[in-house]
Amino acid sequence: MPELYIITGSNGAGKSSLGGYFLPINIREKCVVFDGDKLFIDKQREIWKSGITAIKEAKKIAIAFVNDTFNSLIEEAISKKNDFAYEGHFTNDATWDIPKKFKSNDYNIHLIFLGLTNPKISQTRVGERVKVGGHYVDPKTVKANFYGNLEKLDKYFSIFDTLKIMDTSVSEFLEVCNLENGEVVSSVENYLLPKWFVENLPYISQIISAKSNLKT
């Protein structure tokens, strides 16, 4: 079966810089991970250079271009049964239509989630990224993405064939858990679960706790 890999998580958690390392080698070799944020920035700069300097107009054109490109790539991948990989945020129910679409077309779907301790760290990481030429995200959006991604993950996690959740708050990343079809395959001990994980992923935490209790 063809494979879909999705990389998501908090702003500044390393989706673009680190996410690819968590992909299987065969996917890294075959797929270019679609990065809508990067494509948007590149397109917006291209639009400005073309002479359109109105910020709202340039943004509107760039967003439309990204959406059209993404949708075209999705349709092409599904029609050819090609593997596909992309990164993004999943803060509302509509954003989950894409994984469901691949699932309904007989894809194995996989999610890699990169989490951080809190929105403050997320915003700090974004600030550091901007200093070296990366894209800016305003604090309101950072906070909405931080909590929105977690809320929807706890709701929809069972649709994935595999789910890997990492804590990338510090340089030594913590592989928090791995799930297959909604069931825990591996996880850290309960006392090692990060606070952000327990507080914002209550259902997944409950499943991990239940499995841990069965071992004792």
Summary of predicted features, one role per range:
Residues 15:
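Conserved lysine of the Walker
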Residues 9:
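The Walker A (P-loop) glycine that initiates the GxxxxGKT/S ATP-binding motif of P-loop NTPases
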Residues 4-6:
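Short hydrophobic/aromatic beta-strand immediately N-terminal to the Walker A/P-loop
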Residues 20-80:
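Conserved substrate/cofactor phosphate-moiety recognition/catalytic segment
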